[in-house]
Amino acid sequence: MNTAAMSDHIQRLKDDHKDFNVDSLDLNLDSDPYLSFKKWFDEACEKKESEPNAFCLSTVDLKSHQPNSRILYLKDLRDNELVFYTNYNSDKAVQLDTNRKASMLFFWPGLQRQIRINGIVSKVSTEESDQYFSSRPRSSQIGAWASHQSQKLDSSMDIEKRVKELEFRFSQEVPRPEFWGGYALKPIYFEFWQGRPSRLHDRLCFEFLNESWLSYRKNP
């Protein structure tokens, strides 16, 4: 690996950022963090941000105390909870079984915005998981069965073989596997970040304390 070349690229990128030029958060946010999230999410969709429902999910392994992050997709926002789906045998699911605290990060560079959300995660009902799974493309349904997510794989041919076997096994409807389903994150903290000129970015936080939301700002 040519680390010198990589270093050159990093050096060139250090100052290769356009200045931020958006108004202060006071003009953009509601006092209700859920309404503010929906407003920003809708704007990200309307402005054609690339994959606006993509977010980084961070969990922690309690044995090693090692944080782990990966990109997922938000699939629903209901009852003031954010819903995503995964394999219940995956590393993230194993970590969530022992530590239900997790953090989401949405980033929309075109709008110069990001939202960090900390919360407590729980599994959604089997009915909700069934309903979402049935809406997925058949290829994705087969893929959910075929992937032994987070387990070591000797060859990509192994999983391709499983896919062919499963396509034959499920010649018609594909049922949801018991090891696959949804999680819902109940927020206890929101941080809305808006880029501003001279790197004096706005950070407006909402923390759920004593059954109500407390709002405050943080230094950039």
List where the protein language model places each region.
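Binding-site signature for planar aromatic cofactors or substrates
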Residues: 1-220
